[in-house]
Amino acid sequence: MGQSGRSRHQKRARAQAQLRNLEAYAANPHSFVFTRGCTGRNIRQLSLDVRRVMEPLTASRLQVRKKNSLKDCVAVAGPLGVTHFLILSKTETNVYFKLMRLPGGPTLTFQVKKYSLVRDVVSSLRRHRMHEQQFAHPPLLVLNSFGPHGMHVKLMATMFQNLFPSINVHKVNLNTIKRCLLIDYNPDSQELDFRHYSIKVVPVGASRGMKKLLQEKFPNMSRLQDISELLATGAGLSESEAEPDGDHNITELPQAVAGRGNMRAQQSAVRLTEIGPRMTLQLIKVQEGVGEGKVMFHSFVSKTEEELQAILEAKEKKLRLKAQRQAQQAQNVQRKQEQREAHRKKSLEGMKKARVGGSDEEASGIPSRTASLELGEDDDEQEDDDIEYFCQAVGEAPSEDLFPEAKQKRLAKSPGRKRKRWEMDRGRGRLCDQKFPKTKDKSQGAQARRGPRGASRDGGRGRGRGRPGKRVA
């Protein structure tokens, strides 16, 4: 049996073809279409419609959140090969459309004078033709009236041309051209008309009945006696199905196009059906860079050479200050790092000397710090023993002048909390906080005459009646 599956050469050829397709796809321009700020529902829908125009070379499921800044989008666009940003924003008075070229600019800012969504355009048409296969390839760009009207007009034309991949008219496949994007410039009003169309190619030179027979859906001929009635008169067909064709849209096909009757070297009519969206734009300004930079052109503001020179000097001064701050910050970081390293070395040397010095003291017989602390504690205990012996011998506490060192040592220590004793109050049935009774400087004779607390002089039990003594037999 022969070996099943593809051969090694077939696998290699397929891998090389896939690699070429990926390289060709990466070489094409790609775009991000999103909104910035609080735009509202209609502007968000307009951004989705513009994203539909830019398919398939755009991020159709792009989600930009409020916390994402323009720098975040630029950082993401680099690895993905995105070359253009199309941003829609809205203020209290106007709607703006920005076209940015990545990564170095320029940025074109347009004011949206009027716009219509896809649903508005489709609802106004009697018949519309739009399906998913049309968006499998980028649209054909048509620029009209972009003549020698200034450098800003030439820049606009270049920016729009770079939005879509270039087309080689000698090698292009006509079956891949299903849509058309028309941008018309009006020199008088300086406005741009943005229109999006669907392209349909139909054969010419045939009657309405023959065109109906060539369609995929066969017409209803239940009321006809013969097929000649359909071919001769076109009975049963509405007048709206007959569209006027002329020299403006009839051409000879250089190659066969998908559709019945569209053969090579035959006459066919190219029909356009608007599918939206629709915008009327006016250029406001042209800036260097991505959103921030020198204004190269402005439609409403004009500045003299002195003002431009002053702006340029202020910008250069700002850049110099920024570079100076960065250099100072780098020096501070280096200095702190050196100080940290020197402190670490000094600490290690001190720890090393401390270890060496401790061993030398033990060898020479000098008491260490621990031993001196222990001797100090013994002195404190000796002073306490002297005070206690004086109290036992004399019967009262000594004066402060007799033992001044003990007082100073007590003051040096941090005072502790007072001790408390918790006892159960039998009468009330709850815990009570009782403090130790304070000792007063009285003689033992006075304490003996007074007796314990609550005891009477006659040996009774206080306020109550005394219990009789026991009899002694």
UniProtKB/Swiss-Prot annotation:
Gene encoding the protein: PPAN
Function noted in UniProt: May have a role in cell growth.
Other noteworthy facts: A chimeric transcript, characterized by the first third of PPAN exon 12 joined to P2RY11 exon 2, has been detected. It is possibly produced by trans-splicing. The chimeric transcript is widely expressed and can be induced by retinoic acid during the granulocytic differentiation of the HL-60 cell line. The resulting chimeric protein shows a much lower activity than the non-chimeric P2RY11 gene product, but qualitatively indistinguishable.
The protein's name in its UniProt record: Suppressor of SWI4 1 homolog
Brix domain: residues covered: 29-292
Compositionally biased intervals (Low complexity): 324-334
Single GO term (MF): rRNA binding
Provenance organism: Homo sapiens
Subcellular location(s) per record: Nucleus, Nucleolus
Superkingdom classification of source: Eukaryota
Gene Ontology biological process: maturation of LSU-rRNA from tricistronic rRNA transcript (SSU-rRNA, 5.8S rRNA, LSU-rRNA)
Residues that bear Phosphoserine: 238, 240, 359
N6-acetyllysine: residues carrying this PTM: 438
Xref: Pfam families: Brix
Bias (Basic residues) ranges: 409-421, 462-473
Database matches in InterPro entries: Brix, PPAN-like
GO cellular component term, pick one: nucleolus
Residue ranges, annotated region (Disordered): 323-473
Thylakoid keyword on record: no
